[in-house]
Design a protein with these regions (language model features):
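N-terminal signal-anchor module of multipass membrane proteins
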Residues: 1-57
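Cytosolic-side transmembrane-helix boundaries in multi-pass membrane proteins
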Residues: 1-24, 66, 292-330
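Membrane helical hairpin/interfacial module
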Residues: 35-87
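Structural signature of hydrophobic alpha-helical transmembrane segments
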Residues: 43-55, 94-103, 186, 190-200, ...
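C-terminal ends of transmembrane helices
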Residues: 58-70, 108-119, 205-214, 260-269
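Membrane-interface helix-loop-helix junctions at boundaries between adjacent transmembrane segments
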Residues: 86-155
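Loop-to-transmembrane alpha-helix initiation sites
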Residues: 122-126, 246-254, 276, 294-307
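Long hydrophobic alpha-helical segments that form multi-pass transmembrane helix bundles
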Residues: 125-204
Length: 330
């Protein structure tokens, strides 16, 4: 007789993981990057982050209470705070407060709560908010303050980012290559950009913490970074006067932030290890294609959102093994 019992009877021992525990673990991993942004951007970083987090918490509470008629305890699980921090990390430090609030409203209201809240959203809410602001306010979203203006906010002096210089080189301005910071500067954070782009080292510290705590696995971030390195390396070998080295591609822009904190979102990424690898490779390829051949200097946000849409399809063809399933005898 076939044994149909594929899961053992109770009682079961709880593993200790919970949504709230993992969310606050991610927040701890974000602390190094936040401290670095404070060091380089000062008041602007504090205002942008505080406004984004407060707005996300408020809209999560208000929409849940008055529109969805759901319990408002979800504001305590940490997901809205993470959305606020990640949205802030995708914004320049001189962005006006009212634009930040609009981004938070779109991220929470459209990107998350309109689908039913945490666990139901098909797209990363923070990235949805960033792309909405980028398309709606392109001038404000591409004005990057120069690092070191600790007390300046909206009146901060702006300058070109490494990705903007790379794009100029692709368009034929060979002098732009000499203006791109070296790898050490990009690693430490001495360059302009969004709050979360300034230091690859701080983001790698966060990655190490999350891997240590087993909040995420290595499959998505490593597959993204390796794919970008290989693809960008091929392009650099083909035309080194036009395309920068793969190391500079890895350390510049929002690649590290996206690979570590955005693409690894539980809700919008595949469940199986095989699916994660496919997902990560596709994000890496799309990012390089958009960076080198697209209209925008940065392609990470668009690449992740595109692959978010393919996550259900990847899950369909890369189903994880069911717990307790017995392998078929050959």
């Amino acid at each position: 007789m076939e044994n149909k019992l594929i899961v053992s009877l109770s009682t079961h021992v709880h593993g200790g993981d919970s949504v709230q525990k993992n969310m606050y673990g991610v927040l701890i991993a974000l602390i190094p990057a936040f401290l670095v942004s404070l060091y380089f951007f000062g008041l602007g970083a504090l205002i942008v982050t505080a406004t984004s987090v407060a707005a996300c918490l408020f809209f999560e509470w208000a929409i849940g209470k008055y529109l969805l008629k759901k319990p408002t305890t979800t504001i305590c699980d940490g997901s809205a705070i993470i959305t606020g921090v990640l949205l802030a990390f995708n914004l320049p430090s001189n962005l006006p407060v009212w634009i930040i609030i609009l981004g938070a409203l779109f991220a929470i209201g459209v990107g998350k709560m309109s689908f039913g809240g945490l666990g139901c959203n098909p797209f990363n809410p923070a990235l949805a908010g960033r792309v909405f602001l980028l398309l709606s306010f392109p001038v404000q979203m591409t004005s990057w303050p120069v690092v070191g203006q600790l007390t300046a906010y909206t009146d901060a002096t702006t300058g070109a980012t490494p990705l903007a210089l790379m794009k100029q080189a692709i368009y034929g301005n060979t002098d732009a290559l000499s203006q791109i910071p070296d790898a050490l500067s990009l690693l430490i954070g001495q360059n302009g950009g969004c709050l979360g782009e300034v230091s690859a080292l701080a983001l790698l510290i966060g990655l190490a913490y999350m891997l240590w705590k087993k909040i995420i696995t290595w499959h998505i971030p490593v597959s993204i970074l390796v794919t970008v390195f290989v693809f960008a390396g091929i392009m650099h070998l083909a035309d080194p006067e036009k395309y920068v080295s793969p190391v500079l591609q890895l350390l510049s822009g929002g690649l590290m932030l996206g690979a570590v904190f955005m693409a690894t979102d539980y809700v919008t990424s595949p469940m199986s290890k095989k699916g994660m690898l496919i997902y990560g490779v596709c994000i890496g390829l799309l990012t390089v294609v958009i960076r080198l051949f697209g209209a925008y200097p940065e392609g990470m946000s668009f690449a992740i959102l595109i692959m978010n849409a393919f996550t259900p399809l990847i899950n369909t063809y890369c189903k994880p093994k069911r717990f307790g399933e017995v392998a078929k005898k050959k």
